Amino acid sequence: MILAMISWGASWPAAKIVGQYANPQDLIVWRFAFALVAMLIVMKIFNIPLTFPAKSLKFVVSASMLILIYNYNYLKGTQVGQSGLGGVIVPTLSPLLTFVFSVLFLKNKLQSKESIGLVVGLIGAVLLVRAWEMNANTVISSGNIYFLLGATVWAGATIFTQKASFELHPINFSFWVYGIAMLFALPVFPIDALTAIFSYDWIFWINFILISMIALGLGTTAYFITTMRLGSGKASSFMFIVPFSAVISSSIFLGEVIALTTVIGGIFAIMAVYIINK
């Protein structure tokens, strides 16, 4: 599980490297395809049936649309912005947004400690995106808009995942979500991108396999298996590894300078998630 979370963190600078070769719309379908292959292998090893989500199909389709939007923002954000910052914003803010959505749409009650956690999380968010410097141009050019949208749609996908959990094994659910998302992406998939990917060098392929088969396919699978064995509370605590892995790997491989506000904001966001889940 620790290796899976490290791979999630390392996938952020890897996505930036991949973004130097092609645009998001050229890569999304292939990313889903490689992840599906990895999931099929895992499902075969663990004898997980490929059950069609008949009863929860509307939740699967809804989650698929959000996952497609998330992957575009993930690839576009890392292409134009700092991958290390994205690797802090998305993993730390998405659990907070998931909690907010669960209160709004699932009618979960808000307790006092959870209110404190949300305030702490808001402070963290302000520091992460350096809200005092924000205007329309800097939000887009910095890539922060894509990271914020990514965190939001990932939280929405998590809500639909919870609604579908009664019918499907988590890995089976992920397979159908990514599979349907791939179908949704096909209409905007350029024809020349079908073969262009095979002309890229080994640097591209190492990083692309990391963000698709390892991080998206095997990493997600490891997370779900740990969730089933340890429970969602303990499993989610491993997510705290992701921001630090993203920051360190972005600094090592891309030479990104991580701002102090990113570190402090990430700590505040992690504290908020801890307070809410305590």
Label the model's feature ranges:
Residues 1-26, 69, 73, 136-163:
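Glycine-/small-residue-enriched transmembrane alpha-helix faces in small-molecule transporters
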Residues 7, 11-12, 40-90, 127, ...:
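Specific transmembrane alpha-helical segments of multi-pass solute transporters/efflux pumps
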Residues 13-21, 76-79, 83, 129-142, ...:
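Membrane-interface helix termini and inter-helical loops of multi-pass transporters
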Residues 18, 27, 31, 77, ...:
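Hydrophobic/aromatic residues within transmembrane alpha-helices
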Residues 26-41, 45, 57, 61, ...:
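Hydrophobic alpha-helical transmembrane segments of multi-pass integral membrane proteins
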Residues 28-30, 72, 85-93, 160-183, ...:
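Helix-helix packing/entry segments at the starts of transmembrane helices
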Residues 39, 61, 113-132, 185, ...:
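Hydrophobic transmembrane alpha-helices of multi-pass small-molecule transport proteins
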Residues 41-47, 94-119, 244-264:
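C-terminal transmembrane-helix exit sites in multi-pass transporters
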